[in-house]
Every structure is written in C-alpha cells, then in structure tokens.
Curated annotation (Swiss-Prot):
InterPro entries: ATP-grasp (IPR011761), ATP-grasp_carboxylate-amine (IPR003135), ATP_grasp_subdomain_1 (IPR013815), PreATP-grasp_dom_sf (IPR016185), PurT (IPR005862), PurT/PurK_preATP-grasp (IPR054350), PurT_C (IPR048740), Rudment_hybrid_motif (IPR011054). The gene is purT. It holds the Pfam family PurT_C. One of its GO terms (cellular component) is cytosol. The keyword Endoplasmic reticulum does not apply. Its EC number is 6.3.1.21. This is Formate-dependent phosphoribosylglycinamide formyltransferase. Residues 119-307 form the ATP-grasp domain. It is an enzyme of class 6 (ligase).
Amino acid sequence: MTTIGTPLRTNATKVMMLGSGELGKEVVIELQPLGVEVIAVDRYDNAPAQQVAHRAYTISMLDGNALRDLVEKEKPDFIVPEVEAIATATLVELEQEGYNVIPTAKATQLTMNREGIRRLAAEELGLKTSPYRFVDNFEQFQQAIQEIGIPCVVKPIMSSSGHGQSVIKSEADIQQAWDYSQQGGRAGGGRVIVEGFIKFDYEITQLTVRHIHGIVFSSHRHIQVDGDYRESWQPQQMSDIALKKAQETAEKITSALGGRGIFGVELFVCGDEIIFNEVSPRPHDTGIVTMASQELSQFALHARAILGLPIPEIYRISPAASKAIVVEGKSDNVRFGGVDKVLAEIGTNIRLFGKGEVNGHRRLGVILARDENTVRALETSRRAYDKLDIQL
C-alpha cells in the first residue's frame, strides 16, 4: 500500500527535482495534486519548474559537495534527475546510502553521455545502431570520418537539444563540425561521437513506463531539426512487426537501466526494422504531445511511476500534434502576442514555459492541437503557430 503525507508537514512525501526545465515543470504540476511536496533545483534562478514548486534552490549540480549538502538538508523521499549535467558519482553514493534515485543512479550515470548508453545498447545488449566511433581530438576525428564515411553525424558525448550537433555532408564541413562540437557540449569541449548517417523512413519516440506492476508503452512520431525537436504527433501508423520490434528494443534497454519511471527511447524506423538511437531516463521533449493525445500525459505517467502507483493502461483520447515555439535572437524581455488568436483555433492549447531569456535559439513554449486525425492536427498546430507574435 502506498502512503502519501501532507505537503509542508513533518510527514510530507518529498520529491527533489534535479533540473527544473519545462519537462520538470509539468512533472511538478502532476505531483502536487497527488499531495507531494516538491523541491526544484537548477543552475539558474527562476527556472520553469522552480516557478511552481514548494521550494527552489540554485546550485551547480555538477558540484558533488553542493548536491550532497542539499540532499542531506532536505532528505527527499525521491530524487528525480531531469537533466544530464549532474554529479552522477554523488547520486550513486547517495543511492547506496539509501536515497531513492529515479529511475536509478546507474541509469542517470549511463545516459548522461552518449558513450555509456551506446556501448550498453550495441556492445552489451546487441541492439541495432548506426556505425559509430568515439574520438578525443581532431586527428582521431578525421580518421573516424574516413572510416564511417560521408555523410555522417557529429555529436558531443554530453549535450542535448541539438547543442554541438551537426551533419557532415562534404569534406568542407569537417573543420566547422569539429569546432561546433567543442563549443556545444554540456561540459565544454572534449570527446565526441561520429555516427554513420541512417537512411530511415521516420523517427519515433517509444515512451516506456516502468511502474510497480510492469511495463507499458506509448509511441509517437517526431521531427527534429539539427537534433532539436520541432514537431511531434500521435498516433503514428506503423506495421505490427515494426511496433513489436520497437517495444522489444525499448524493453531491453530500459530493463538494463532498471528502476521505475518513464523513459524516452528514440528509434529510427526503416520498413519493419528498428534501429536504436538514444534513450533518456525521464520525460521526453517530443512527448509533450501526450498532454493533448492521452488521458494520462507522459508527465502524469512519470509521477505515478515515481510514487509506486499503478498504471492499468494508457488511454488515448484524440489524435493530436505539437509544434515547438523556438525563438531565435537575444533578449531578456520576451513577450508573446497573439495568444488569443492561437487559442481561437478550435482544439488548440499553448504552453509557455516561463524561460526568462534567449541568446541564440531556445525553445520557449509549445502549441498543442487535437483534431480528427494527425494530418489535420498538424495543420491546426502550424496555423496557430503562424498567428503567434513573438516580441524580443
């Protein structure tokens, strides 16, 4: 039997979010109606999840001592990493001391860099992946490109949302791709992965929820530009064979990582074949579409799994689509005009994340749309997006 205390009382059930972005914000919003006290932590003040949590702290989560001090001060029942840039060695120690890390400290440590998870998937589990090489310097980088061939994809081993990622289409791109990879990693310059370019039919995210009574799945299709999510929709028509292989692949990788919670497993679909790309042990940015398409969004599913609550089934309520609001420029005073026009479109909703500034390009919100099918839902989301007036 699961027992939940009362927030802001001595018997409170406490969740500490490590990372307080827009995905963490929605998890906080789902945890609070379940009676959970939430502490939101990030590297900068007033991050999205901090705006809705009971308490907020600003620290460098790569500082193991600062992270330990905060955990020992708050004594959370559950520690929930939402980003990669965390002192994972400290999480391993805390877990060994009895703290509950979601899904596990091992999962957080392995997935914080692409090398750990790629070697687990390809070399230990035997999952199909693109050909790859890991390199530490420009000389190795050139050799890897020669072995893999052009076109190929370059990514820092520690980055997200496309930062530092590029596609080499000709030899003229090599130097620029290396330089960009050294600027875009979460931990600065360093080791990168060079991957063979996969000719796929489409990409899906296989949301995989490990909960107290087993595993449930929910898949959706997405489009990325330079490694960053732009659109997603659900449902995505795919063959029964491909769907079964996608679920088997997702179950293998998430079972190896262990624990409870939601995982976003990125897969390439080539006919009936499935090729593993990446996995995140947390809600996935492309999964925001589930806020419109499912009775229980990915955030609600994660909240239930964290607390050890049952998930009998995932019920889909409507075809739906999401379109990311990506802003380019420089400003600390972003405003959104035309929100009334966006919401005048039947079946639409908008989520503005509350991020305080933009310097370059940054995802600041998302438009959601429901319709009778995914084609119409995508059209509605794009039409609504065009009515938004972003002011820097």
